[in-house]
Amino acid sequence: MLIIPAIDLKDGACVRLRQGLMEDATVFSDDPVAMAAKWVDGGCRRLHLVDLNGAFEGKPVNGEVVTAIARRYPDLPIQIGGGIRSLETIEHYVRAGVSYVIIGTKAVKQPEFVGEACRAFPGKVIVGLDAKDGFVATDGWAEVSEVQVIDLARRFEADGVSAIVYTDISKDGMMQGCNVEATAALANATRIPVIASGGIHNLGDIQKLLDARTPGIIGAITGRAIYEGTLDVAEAQALCDNFKA
């Protein structure tokens, strides 16, 4: 399992939100490229970038920062989400050197777009499913749908999606522990690999994900915990590497 540091971009700065609320943002750095360097130096093997402005505006806003990070670390797998709602945007990021694009809102509202994207950019597409009480949320979490997460995930199996980033909104940015049960249930219900997101606070939370013994969980995204120092990237990755399932 990979430990994947998150860099959330708002107005060119690196921030963290609590429960997806744009008005509840903590700025951790005004130099996201330097922040990426910190996590790379700390031993991370993959980065998770989010264009928060893009998620709310429906188009890339912090694209220059994303490109700068991708060009600085051409051998590091980077995944980007936020405002990805067209094939043109995906092409822009792929050309910039990004390894994976995460389709969120559009995957829920127009599921057929995921198939189009997978055909145009095979192996490059991740679906981001954000949930509240098992139901999918969209538009920067502003709307909660009547669609069950597991039902939607199964729909994408035939498309060739590389992974699902699963976020429990009630946990995100609160550092109260990951929703292991829901994450494992999703991973067991679909053939698509799952990346856990939201609520990871410390090594104990990583251990709980490992203890779920769910091969389908291939990574864990962490944000506030690594910024506030309750989790060390290298230590967490070592725990994963040494875990015997």
UniProtKB/Swiss-Prot annotation:
Report the pathway entry.
Amino-acid biosynthesis; L-histidine biosynthesis; L-histidine from 5-phospho-alpha-D-ribose 1-diphosphate: step 4/9
Gene Ontology molecular function, alphabetical: 1-(5-phosphoribosyl)-5-[(5-phosphoribosylamino)methylideneamino]imidazole-4-carboxamide isomerase activity
Gene Ontology cellular component terms for the protein in this record: cytoplasm
Q: Which domain of life is it from?
A: Bacteria
Reactions catalysed, as given in the entry: 1-(5-phospho-beta-D-ribosyl)-5-[(5-phospho-beta-D-ribosylamino)methylideneamino]imidazole-4-carboxamide = 5-[(5-phospho-1-deoxy-D-ribulos-1-ylimino)methylamino]-1-(5-phospho-beta-D-ribosyl)imidazole-4-carboxamide
Q: In the UniProt record, does the keyword Cell cycle occur?
A: no
State the UniProt keywords alphabetically: Amino-acid biosynthesis, Cytoplasm, Histidine biosynthesis, Isomerase
Q: Does the keyword Amino-acid biosynthesis apply?
A: yes
InterPro entries given in the database record: Aldolase_TIM, His_biosynth, HisA_bact_arch, Isoase_HisA-like, Isoase_HisA-like_bact, RibuloseP-bd_barrel
Q: What is its EC number?
A: 5.3.1.16
Residue ranges crossing the lipid bilayer per the database entry: none
Going by the record, the broad EC class of this enzyme is isomerase
> What is the annotated localization of this protein?
Cytoplasm
Q: List this protein's GO terms for biological process.
A: L-histidine biosynthetic process; L-tryptophan biosynthetic process
Q: Which residues form the active site?
A: D8, D130
Q: Cross-referenced Pfam families, in alphabetical order?
A: His_biosynth (PF00977)
Name the family the entry cites: Belongs to the HisA/HisF family.
Mind telling me which NCBIfam families this protein's record contains?
A: 1-(5-phosphoribosyl)-5-[(5-phosphoribosylamino)methylideneamino]imidazole-4-carboxamide isomerase
What is the protein named? 1-(5-phosphoribosyl)-5-[(5-phosphoribosylamino)methylideneamino] imidazole-4-carboxamide isomerase
Name of the gene: hisA
